[in-house]
Amino acid sequence: MAAPVGRTLLGLARGWRQLDRFWAGSSRGLSLEAASSSSRSPWRLSGALCLQRPPLITKALTPLQEEMAGLLQQIEVERSLYSDHELRALDEAQRLAKKKADLYDEEQEQGITLAQDLEDMWEQAFLQFRPGARETEADKKNDRTSLHRKLDRNLVLLVREKLGDQDVWMLPQVEWQPGETLRGTAERILATLSENNMEAKFLGNAPCGHYKFKFPKAIQTESDLGVKVFFFKALLLTGDFVQAGKKSRHVWASKEELGDYLQPKYLAQVRRFLLDSDGLSCL
């Protein structure tokens, strides 16, 4: 008799545990759904691309740098060993001196001045070399839509977009789409710029900066306050931003020129992740 009663009590206990799990799961699902709906952010997310063209040539040396470079070159020459060419030239000079003293065998005459001939050829090639101009035609015309300007500086791509009834200069940006990463949003910007004509190397998966702005009160709601923009750096490898008939919609600007285009609050946030051009890293 005791055994059937024990089995009955055990079955009732199992049934209560199943009911508890069911109600707990149901309440948890309802609470998660309520939390997700209540925690939905009123801010839209956007990704922005900080596309930089790194310097193509070195900066011109200052007088102090030129003096230091000359001093280091002098120290290098004084402490260095003879190169193979210099040893060969010294050997040929000794053989030539023996020839003048009638101590030189005519069978060894071949190639006496070969090292000197090489030096003469190199000297002629050096005299014919003309270095490229540091100032390009775009620099002379102040054509900021051209990528071939300020070759010793970093340049950043800015575009002019329509926001409401205003034309605003900014870094290229688009709205984030569900299912993609913020870096994926920045990569999508690059793909749409100039019809996939540019290739760039992204510097990491994390944003280098952010900026947020609120919508005008006329269109602002409790569930739609404004936009949070996350910036991603990328270095231009190949290509150029070329759009026929839209040359006034983009510029390649140096750090000092950003103030001519960007609004003060936006510029202050952008400058936080743009290093000085004389720094060790890009921009």
Swiss-Prot record:
Keyword Acetylation included in the entry's annotation: yes
Gene3D superfamilies found in the cross-reference section? Nucleoside Triphosphate Pyrophosphohydrolase (3.90.79.10)
UniProt-annotated location(s): Mitochondrion
What molecular function does GO assign, one term? structural constituent of ribosome
Q: Output a single Gene Ontology CC term carried by this record.
A: mitochondrion
Grouped into one coarse class, the protein's main location is mitochondrion
GO BP annotations listed: mitochondrial translation
- Provide the protein name: Large ribosomal subunit protein mL46
Species annotation? Mus musculus (Mouse)
